[in-house]
Amino acid sequence: TNVFANDVSEIKNIVIHKDLKVYDNVIFSDKNDKKINIKEFNGNLLLLNFWATWCEPCKEEMPSLDRLQVNQNLSNLKIFAINISQESKKKVDSFFEDLNIENFDPYFDAPTTLAKTFSLRGIPTSILIDKDGKEFARIIGSINFDDNIFIDWLKTYN
């Protein structure tokens, strides 16, 4: 058997940090403009997915991301899909409806605040944050969130 069969580094686009990164103020809004601070979710495994409706790879990965939220082996996972391009709530809602996204809500970044905080180079980008609030990995570009290698790896942080 291949020892590396479950090696997440085989999945392109995943960057695993040796030095965990801590961010002080990671704040974004829900669709009612209520502010959300990720500190409220310490103790949870967080996936912050940055996206826009015009982004084709974002559109491709969103359904598998939606399924990831209800994966029974990842009960501690919270997904925040954060729109970073100041699109109208109406446009974002219809994007979610068209793709049948049902397991998480859209969130909104104040004009590119988090894009700067996380030094995003493009979208989609997903930031993975452990139970202590530290970024331990990021996914630059899209992946298939149904990938069992990815899910098994993520379970180790759950």
Regions found by a protein language model. Give the residues of each.
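Soluble periplasmic/extracytoplasmic beta-strand elements of cell-envelope proteins
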Residues: 49, 81-83, 138-140
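Active-site acidic short loop of glycosyltransferases
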Residues: 41-44, 74, 101-103, 120-121
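Extracytoplasmic
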Residues: 21-23, 41-43, 74-77, 87
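Thiol/disulfide oxidoreductase modules built on the thioredoxin-like
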Residues: 97-102, 109-153
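N-terminal "domain-start" segment that seeds a small globular fold
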Residues: 4-38
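Short active-site neighborhood of thiol/selenol oxidoreductases, capturing the structured segment around
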Residues: 36-59, 65
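Structural microenvironment flanking redox-active thiols in thiol-disulfide oxidoreductases
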Residues: 60-99, 110-117
